[in-house]
C-alpha cells in the first residue's frame, strides 16, 4: 500500500478519502530539514500553502510519485525540479470557488451598506 504524507492541515474528510487507498501519516508543521529526512519513505505528499517543496526536498524524495496541493496555486512547489524527477504536481483549482464567491458577496454588501466608512468614523 502506498504511503502518503499530509504535511499541512486538511479536512478530516480528505484524510479519510486518502486512507481508503493509502497509508496516511499526518505530520503538520514540519520544518524543511525534517521534511528532507522523512520524505524518502513516502509515495505521495499532500500540502497546502504552508509547506514549501524546494529542490532539496524533491531530490531527497526517492519514492515520491505525486505532490498534491489542496488549493489553487503551486507556487510553493519547485515544479521544474519535480517534473525532471518524474513527480506529478497537481492542485485543486476549484477548491476555493465557494469561499471566493461568498467573500465577493460580503464585500458587495459591505460597500452597499457603507461599512468601511462607518468603521473609519
Whereabouts are the PLM-identified features?
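Phosphate-binding beta-alpha-beta segment of Rossmann-like dinucleotide-binding domains, i.e.
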Residues: 85, 93-121
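An N-terminal-biased, well-structured beta-alpha scaffold segment characteristic
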Residues: 1-92
Amino acid at each position: 500500500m502506498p504511503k502518503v504524507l499530509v504535511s499541512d492541515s486538511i479536512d478530516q474528510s480528505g484524510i479519510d478519502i486518502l486512507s481508503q487507498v493509502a497509508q496516511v501519516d499526518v505530520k503538520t508543521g514540519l520544518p524543511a530539514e525534517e521534511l528532507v529526512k522523512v520524505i524518502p519513505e513516502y509515495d505521495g505528499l499532500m500540502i497546502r500553502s504552508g509547506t514549501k517543496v524546494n529542490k532539496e526536498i524533491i531530490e531527497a524524495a526517492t519514492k515520491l510519485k505525486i505532490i498534491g496541493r489542496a488549493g489553487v496555486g503551486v507556487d510553493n512547489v519547485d515544479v521544474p525540479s519535480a517534473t525532471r524527477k518524474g513527480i506529478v504536481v497537481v492542485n485543486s483549482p476549484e477548491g476555493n470557488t465557494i469561499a471566493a464567491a461568498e467573500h465577493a458577496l460580503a464585500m458587495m454588501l459591505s460597500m452597499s451598506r457603507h461599512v468601511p466608512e462607518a468603521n473609519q468614523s
